[in-house]
Amino acid sequence: MSNKCDVVVVGGGISGMAAAKLLHDSGLNVVVLEARDRVGGRTYTLRNQKVKYVDLGGSYVGPTQNRILRLAKELGLETYKVNEVERLIHHVKGKSYPFRGPFPPVWNPITYLDHNNFWRTMDDMGREIPSDAPWKAPLAEEWDNMTMKELLDKLCWTESAKQLATLFVNLCVTAETHEVSALWFLWYVKQCGGTTRIISTTNGGQERKFVGGSGQVSERIMDLLGDRVKLERPVIYIDQTRENVLVETLNHEMYEAKYVISAIPPTLGMKIHFNPPLPMMRNQMITRVPLGSVIKCIVYYKEPFWRKKDYCGTMIIDGEEAPVAYTLDDTKPEGNYAAIMGFILAHKARKLARLTKEERLKKLCELYAKVLGSLEALEPVHYEEKNWCEEQYSGGCYTTYFPPGILTQYGRVLRQPVDRIYFAGTETATHWSGYMEGAVEAGERAAREILHAMGKIPEDEIWQSEPESVDVPAQPITTTFLERHLPSVPGLLRLIGLTTIFSATALGFLAHKRGLLVRV
């Protein structure tokens, strides 16, 4: 016996839940099948007496992320600003350098040119890439066949710029520079609004968090849908050979629907058997797109002692020996439950996963004591962490990355329906893909694709723009005249070379005119 409905949504993360809510609000009968014993997917809010609540997964929202802000507001959630009142720290070669603003300052003029050229070139290249079809960029194949490591080797002349650029890649996509396609990474940064928007706290992707945690987005939609959300129901089989689509779960329940939305990371499609088999390109694509590696760590203290030293808690930490490359203040908005959140990224997540939880905490505290110059960092009162690499129903975090050569070959099939199966998930978004914002965009777009297939809305309503949030307005990202026009290091060297040649020629001409050159 099967359970009948209009649409089965596979995956109860933010994308699947956003899709289910829109379809439910449109009068359709929806069932959500979630593999875990909770909704939320790659968002996960843990609650206990020691932490009150803590986001162990996706957490941050900011200006231009208007869909998640609208949905959360509709669900009665509020945001608060991540603390960035005091100074940030850039820790490099064993020394801490306090600063303000999105990027660490650089005092060496040659190094400054190199840093400036890197950020500018990233944004310039990004402007060449269409957000909805990166494979259509003029140099798509050339850039896709190149790793980010190869691009950094071409762009960065100084070790300082290369180190910070490498950290930027590690932090943005939880992968190593040699693992990711340059085209894909350039697209990823571009569709998040560029280098400054993606990396910034104030006026950027990390500006805010939800009071009570981001897990509430999915939980509150589950409250609205009631028993239509089925937990501990991993989907193992989808059959499209009959009049309706049959969906079978691991505990052998059968669900019958007119349409299916797959709202799981693309590679997790390999856990599902399909009849008929998936088309060739999708079948191959899902074997080629892994997720990043990250352990999210939150160290709790008696008080936010770093603020007494005029530090906000943001640390950018260079160096192979440092377990964590980036931190933010995770203290509650009321000033209690003082904490520092840090990411163990990419290969370091794989390496440090061999240690015990206690050993990781010790390494983090020793690092924070060194960077902050405070022994108070050695006295934590509590510790929480989440290793997303071990999650069988995520496969990693934050998101799927594309190795070289894959995006131009297979990217077109990411959102392409397979008969009556439509695809959501943050990976299929065109704006803030990889974030909660992208998850909402993708879920609602997939839901509207089904509404269009059912004849309920016209095709031109599938993709909808979102009005700017009145509560979290975006300020424009600006650059100075100098930042736009300063030469790169090779540009400067060419300039010096030309100037030298010109000067020598001019001197020779003058000497000749004045009869100072003697023929031998």
UniProtKB/Swiss-Prot annotation:
Disulfide bonds: none annotated. One of its GO terms (biological process) is hydrogen peroxide biosynthetic process. Catalyzes the oxidative deamination of primary and some secondary amines such as neurotransmitters, and exogenous amines including the tertiary amine, neurotoxin 1-methyl-4-phenyl-1,2,3,6-tetrahydropyridine (MPTP), with concomitant reduction of oxygen to hydrogen peroxide and participates in the metabolism of neuroactive and vasoactive amines in the central nervous system and peripheral tissues. Preferentially degrades benzylamine and phenylethylamine. This is Amine oxidase [flavin-containing] B. GO terms for molecular function: electron transfer activity; flavin adenine dinucleotide binding; monoamine oxidase activity; primary methylamine oxidase activity. Its EC number is 1.4.3.21, 1.4.3.4. Pfam families: Amino_oxidase. Changing C172S: No loss of activity. It is found in: Mitochondrion outer membrane. It catalyses: a secondary aliphatic amine + O2 + H2O = a primary amine + an aldehyde + H2O2; (R)-adrenaline + O2 + H2O = (R)-3,4-dihydroxymandelaldehyde + methylamine + H2O2; a primary methyl amine + O2 + H2O = an aldehyde + H2O2 + NH4(+); benzylamine + O2 + H2O = benzaldehyde + H2O2 + NH4(+). Its cofactor is FAD. The chain crosses the membrane at residues 490-516. It is an enzyme of class 1 (oxidoreductase). It is a single-pass type IV membrane protein. Keywords: Acetylation, FAD, Flavoprotein, Membrane, Mitochondrion, Mitochondrion outer membrane, Oxidoreductase, Transmembrane, Transmembrane helix. InterPro entries: Amino_oxidase, FAD/NAD-bd_sf, Flavin_amine_oxidase, Flavin_MAO.
